[in-house]
Amino acid sequence: MAGPVFEWLMFVGSWVKLSDDTAARLGAVFGIILIGLLAGSVLTAPVGSAPVVVAPLNPHEEAHLPAEQIPVPEGYPPMASDAAEGASFIHNFGDGHDPTRWYKANMTYPSPHPAWLARHIHFFDDRVELELRRMRVGAKKLAGAEYQRRGLYSFGRVEVVMTPAPGSGTVSALFTHTSEQFGAQHDEIDIEFLGKDLNMVTANYFTDGEPYRYLEIPLPFDASKEVHLYAFDWEPDRIRWYVDGELMHTATHDDHPIPQHPSRIIIQLWSGQEEQFQWHGLPTFEDGTRAAYYCISYLKAGDTGPQCSDTFDPVAANAGRAAN
C-alpha cells in the first residue's frame, strides 16, 4: 500500500518542485499513517468480523473447572460443608446470596452461550431475578445470568418455584450439569422454557454427552404470568418430571441410559447464536427481560426434609399476584 502512495507523492513532488528526497520522506510518513488507519479499521470492525479471543472476565472463575481444582479467590469464602457433601437443601431466594453455597457466574467462554454477568443477578425480598441484555462483552453480543449451587449432587428430587422470561429467543432454565471440566462425561437433566411459547415447558436429559429426546409438555397457562412449581425426580433407572405435583413425563433406562454422575444444580437465563434460532426463536425479546426464581430445593434420595412444595400453593400464589 505504501508503494502507490510513494509514487503518487513523487508525482506531486515533481509538480510542486519538491526534491526526490523530500517526496520520499513524505511518502514514508503517509504510508505509515495509511497503514495505521487500516489497522485501526480492523480493530474497530463490527462484532463478528474480527478474530475472536475469549478470556474469563474473572481470573478466579470457578465454573467449568474440575471440581477438585476450583480455586478460591481472595475474599471468597470456602464452600460450606453441607454443599461440599452434596447434602439436601432448601433455599428461598428472598434470603439473599450465600457465597459459601452459591456462585454467581461472571465470565465468558467459547460456546454458543452469552456472557454471564454477576450484575445480572438481582435479589429481592421474595425472589431472585436473572436478566438478559443485548450488550458487547468481549466477543459476545449478549449477556445473561447463571447462578450455581456449589457442590455436586446426585440422585434425588429437585424443585423450583419460578416464572420464566418472556420473549422470543430467551431460555429460562433449571438443570443439573456435569462435564469433562468437572472430571466426568457430560450428564444433564433439564427443565427449560422457551420465551417464544410459554404455554409449554420443555424437558430433556443427556448421558455421557448423548441426548434423550426433546420433550414439549403443554401447560394450561402462560408460565411467564403465573408462579408455578416444576420438579424432577432423578433415580438410577428413571427420571420423572412434574408441574405443580402432577406427573407429566417419565423416562426410563430402557428409553435411554439415565445420568449417573453427581452434578451441579444451576439456574440460567440465556439466548444463543444463529445455530439455536430454529430452536428458541429469533432473539426479538425486550432488552432487559427477566426470569424470577422464588424457591429451589434438593432432597437427596433416602432423605426426609423440607422442600419448596411443602409451603407452595399455586392457587394462593397466583391469587396474590392478581390482587397486586
Regions found by a protein language model. Name each.
Residues 20-29:
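Bacterial N-terminal signal peptides that target proteins for export
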Residues 20, 44-324:
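GH16 jelly-roll
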Residues 1-21:
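N-terminal secretory signal peptides that target proteins for export/translocation
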Residues 29-40:
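Hydrophobic membrane-insertion alpha-helices, especially the h-region
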